[in-house]
Amino acid sequence: VTGHSCGGLTTLLFMSRYPDKAGGGISYMQACFGKLSSKYKVKKNGVEKAMAKFRKKNQGPHDLRQKMNDEIKNNLIAPILAFTHPKDKYEGLLSDWLEEIPGMKRIVISEDYKINGKSCKRKGDDWEEPVKKGHDMDVGLCFQYYNPVILNYIASRTK
């Protein structure tokens, strides 16, 4: 099972609830609750203050997010591959909780908009543009650098 953004969080939630229904999961930039990292200034204020402000302004979504994250942390047993980026405005600076999950392989893609020293671009048949958002790093051609990691993960889950 794999997903990006809210699909990434859904992948984690699915695998925590139904570990016997799929061989594994790959999550890309998990996030379902808006641009929390940027809107609540996580870099400047820290995680605790930012989340307190989010809860004050949006208690229902905050509590649902916390409930889902706790469920994932407490129940996820299958090895999962998760990609995050610190410049992801959604949850890029709020992903450290993934490190608490046994079997989780979290990959912080890069600290900037390059992977392995190469600028990230998206290409079409007759267009090309730089990837300008951390949330979109997995759609850049440079993300192919991680193909061996992904293929090794898939191979490890199909044995």
Where are these regions (language model features)?
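Primarily recognizes the serine-hydrolase "nucleophile elbow" in alpha/beta-hydrolase
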Residues: 1-45
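Active-site-proximal beta-strand/loop segments in catalytic clefts of secreted hydrolases
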Residues: 2-5, 28-31, 83-88, 109-112
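C-terminal catalytic histidine-bearing segment of alpha/beta-hydrolase fold enzymes
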Residues: 104-159
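Extracytoplasmic/periplasmic, Sec-exported soluble proteins
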Residues: 6, 72, 138-142
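The feature captures the conserved acid-bearing segment of alpha/beta-hydrolase catalytic domains
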Residues: 32-106
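Sec/Tat-exported extracytoplasmic proteins
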Residues: 18, 29, 84, 154-158
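A general secondary-structure boundary signal
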Residues: 28-29, 95, 120
